Amino acid sequence: LFDGLYISGNKEICDEYMGKYPVIFLSLKDVDGLKYENAKYRIMELIGREAERYFFLGDSDRLSENEKEQYKAVIALQNGKYSMDENVLTSSLRLLSHLLFQHYGEKTVILIDEYDVPLDKAFQNGYYQEMVSLIRGLFGMALKTNDSLQFAVLTGCLRISKESIFTGFNNFEVLSVLNVPYDESFGFTDNEVEKLLDDYTFSDHYPEVKEWYDGYHFGNTDIYCPWDVIRYCKSLCADL
């Protein structure tokens, strides 16, 4: 999958992390709804589908019968829809991480992308307090004092106050685009843009790309928007 890419050349990182831990991944970008119940169901659906990727847990000889029943409660359907009640939903990520730890003997990594979208949509549609309560419970159960958790990474655009949904979290670190150690991680650097243009024999277009798309300064680094640069290169290819 990563042959020829930069990450494949970093042997230490690959040896330490690649394929070593079970992973729970959720993207909350599509969690929306005019009413709380609609948005809550979208979260339920995402977690249910993620749990179904590990369908073998239902028959794992490393889980107790009670644990298998708990897993089945997360993926259970009623009239074709996931049927978790709010208590099961709130504990679902913690439970799934525990079951994966029991099955694999390795702690679980949890990755949650655009964690802030449900809260933003809830604020716009008038059910913010209900969504904050759900997210606080869901994240709190999964990420706080969870012995089955290796680590978790949450990404988002909005800075949600720690007091609203991350109350009492241990070893919680906020990293923004202003943090120097990660300032090259949120877009294309100048060197990467130069190499991209060179690979497509468009090096003579570098001055205009820099003028148009060199739009951000993160930490100590000038950063280009990847989408804009790629679209520009695509338009140049179309003109050949």
Features from the language model and the residues they span:
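P-loop NTPase motor core
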Residues: F2-F56
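Structural recognition of the conserved hydrophobic beta-strand(s) that form the central parallel beta-sheet
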Residues: F25, V109-D113, G137, Q150-C157
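Short regulatory helix/loop adjacent to the ATP-binding pocket of P-loop NTPases
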Residues: Y36, L143-L149, L158-L178
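Short secondary-structure boundary/capping segments
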Residues: K40-I43, Q124-E130, S164-N179, C233-L240
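Substrate-engagement module of ASCE P-loop NTPases
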Residues: A51, S92-H103, E130-Q150
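Short glycine-rich substrate-engagement loop in P-loop NTPases that contacts/grips substrate
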Residues: N79-S97
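Conserved P-loop NTPase "ATPase switch" module shared by AAA+ and STAND
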Residues: Y104-Y128
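Amphipathic alpha-helical segments of the small helical/lid subdomains adjacent to P-loop NTPase cores
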Residues: S164-G168, L175-C233
